[in-house]
């Protein structure tokens, strides 16, 4: 028994040391990539964003700025007055299941834009949340497969949003001439001005909270409830 416990202790010590060395090496391999660039106002007037697994943040800024932090490869180019932004899995990561607890898997793309600069914004998101705040936008398209969509303190005209497993939350915003559809998840509108807009939900509730006395909207859900509350 004595030799057994000694052998077991030696195994545990060497296994632990090897694991720490491997995780430390693997952590360095997943080095965070950073991108930070500003663009001139006349460089483009349309933006197309196609993300696989990156969190997206869009907010107001004094100049158009793109920032990225994460371990994906970020691809950015301008084609025919359209800024195209996309991400893809870095080749250095491989495709094996990540067993390293030291690896932080958070990837964030932040875009700052001045008011009235962009004529059209297209967003396609795979597995990551979409958060839009404090912006004025016309002709916006959002397609999301998995990850919540949040719109706050914004003015959106002609918004076309279609999301799958993506709860959608709109608060303190002006929404007009828009179509918003959720396949699975909550659709919530709070303290917002709504004009000539349609809200659809296949599997989930539609909730209007703290709404003004005049709301020009149509709402329908296949499986769920529609609740409406005026601002008190």
Predicted regions and their residues:
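Extracytoplasmic/luminal low-complexity segments enriched in Pro/Gly and acidic/polar residues
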Residues: 186-232
